[in-house]
Amino acid sequence: MSVTENGDDRTPSAPKHRQMLALLLMNANQVVSMAQFVEELWEYSPPPRAVAAVHTYVMQLRRILHGGATAVACGRLVTREQGYLLRVEDGELDLHLYESRLRAGRALLDAGEPDAGARLLRTADAMWSGTTGLVDAPTGPLLRAALAPIERERTEATVRRIHAELALGRHQELVSELCALVHQDLTHEELTAQLMLALYRSGRQADALAAFHRLRHALREDLATTPGPDVHRLTTDILTGHPRLEPPTTGHLPLTLDAVPTLVAA
């Protein structure tokens, strides 16, 4: 997380300041109540003077955000009867730009523009992986709840983008990325299926089958379940070398994407 104003770095360094600012940004232009601040900052064990501490943090945060110009900061971080509100203009928050690019990328995929859509989704994902993801800010229950749907949406967009790139014949370029993604979630069936296909198309049948066995083991150990029928069908096709798994011969998205696994979430 970073904050800049006219080229000057205004990013808070103290963990509580960063956490408070993250909560305000995730609720930009909306009032964050004192109760919400207390729950986020201290969860189940607030100090006796938690409300007073919040007021102090806000005062300090105002100074940080505007280099000591508290009068200016009060116009940005506004006091309300129930709590505080952070005013954010259009284009100021990277999260909003990230979400805009995500929507535009998906729209391009829907319109049959896989190359342009995939590029835009990659740009959006790079923004999230860089500064938008709040990776260096502490997160309490409210921030975790706010970030969860964004992370789900990000994963869904990644699956769609890779789906398009596989259909464009970019399997070799995708192997390393898919290995890293699957390593982060060993039970994710769609990403594993995409990894299996990318490996198979890259001439690595044994590695593709090994990816299936790792998925089956992880699902059994972590979720007490087994891979779905689509993954089993893909595994059979890999074992038999079914022609439908062959990579596309042109740089255009084929009329049918049956060769690219699209699994239905349980």
Model-found features: residue ranges?
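Short amphipathic alpha-helical recognition elements used for nucleic-acid or partner binding
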Residues: 9-41, 61, 187-195
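Intrinsically disordered, charged and Pro/Gly-enriched terminal/linker segments
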Residues: 10, 26, 46-50, 74, ...
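DNA-recognition element of transcription regulators
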Residues: 14-22, 47-68
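DNA-binding alpha-helical recognition surfaces that contact promoter or target DNA
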Residues: 39, 56, 63, 210, ...
